[in-house]
Curated annotation (Swiss-Prot):
Span of the signal peptide: none
Coiled-coil annotated residue ranges, if any: none
Membrane side Cytoplasmic: residue ranges: 1-11, 99-116
GO cellular component: host cell endoplasmic reticulum membrane; membrane
UniProt source species: White clover mosaic virus (strain M) (WCMV)
Parts of the chain that traverse the membrane: 12-32, 78-98
Family label: Belongs to the Tymovirales TGBp2 protein family.
Disulfide bonds: none
Organism domain of life: Viruses
Protein name: Movement protein TGB2
Residue ranges, Lumenal side: 33-77
UniProt GO BP: transport of virus in host, cell to cell
Length: 116
């Protein structure tokens, strides 16, 4: 059985845009943009305490916050800009594909239901 493309590929594009939007949203929610402290051997990204002979490091341990609230609290302008831009592009793409499908599937007036 040979593989054939779908007769209307717009549904495929709509799902791809939605999936890309979800991937971008997941990336923003999961990524950690907090500053890292310590050296390459003693990394304390969330605060804490380390003692070793002559070396003693103690950083404040922050309460566990959701990474989105940390991102917004730090106001990383690039992250916020990309999130808003991705949302706008996703909504525009969904609107475009929905309008195209509606026009191509029905050749009658939306207001009066007559063909013109």
């Amino acid at each position: 059985m040979p593989l054939t493309p779908p007769p209307n590929p717009q549904k495929t594009y709509q799902i791809a845009i939605l999936a890309l939007g979800l991937v971008l949203l997941a990336f923003v929610l999961i990524s950690d943009h907090s500053p890292k402290v310590g050296d390459h051997l003693h990394n304390l990204p969330f605060g804490g305490e380390y003692k070793d002979g002559t070396k003693s490091i103690k950083y404040f341990q922050r309460p566990n916050q959701h990474s989105l609230s940390k991102t917004l609290a730090k106001s990383h302008n690039t992250t916020i800009f990309l999130l808003i831009l991705g949302l706008i592009v996703t909504l525009h793409g969904l609107h475009y594909f929905n309008n195209n499908r509606r026009v191509s599937s029905s050749l009658h007036c939306v207001l009066c239901q007559n063909k013109h």
